[in-house]
Amino acid sequence: NIANASPIADMPPLLMILDASVVLRKGKERREIGLQDFYLSYKKTVLRESEFIESIRIPKIEHGHLVRVYKVSKRFEDDISASCGAIWMTTENGKIKRAHIAFGGMSEIPKRALNCEKALEGLAWNEETIKLGMEAVRNDFSPITDFRATKEYRLQVSQNLLLRYFHELNNPSANPVRIASHA
């Protein structure tokens, strides 16, 4: 899910917003690189010949931080994402102190939405600010159209996931509950 460099892998967006790094190993040699620097281009990584991912390091986050991951696909189970988003924001005194946002399926590699993050940080935690972030996402990605989704759909989904995150955190009792009829 990480080493094959698929742009629609589910784990990389989450690991990116958590500032995870990968420990790469070849024989006895090891090196550590941030996951957001691991991907170079479509299906290309910084992995050298005979090197492999030995481990993933995730910094500890403080209790109470709310991270959300969303997978959007045509089918409920066993499907490859049309888009996958991971969002983690921290607030202080009613303002967004830190925004970490990443998407898969929005470009040739999974990546952070850096323009969106910058547009949100320091502003009030409200729907108007989130809508500014939704517009800023347009500057982060140039999605493609393929058999899973159109580029317009992918862009709209990424914007809607930001708004969904805001509403879920503002109204925790409204969080959806999914009940499956199987184990």
Annotate the PLM regions.
Residues N1-A183:
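C-terminal structural segment of proteins
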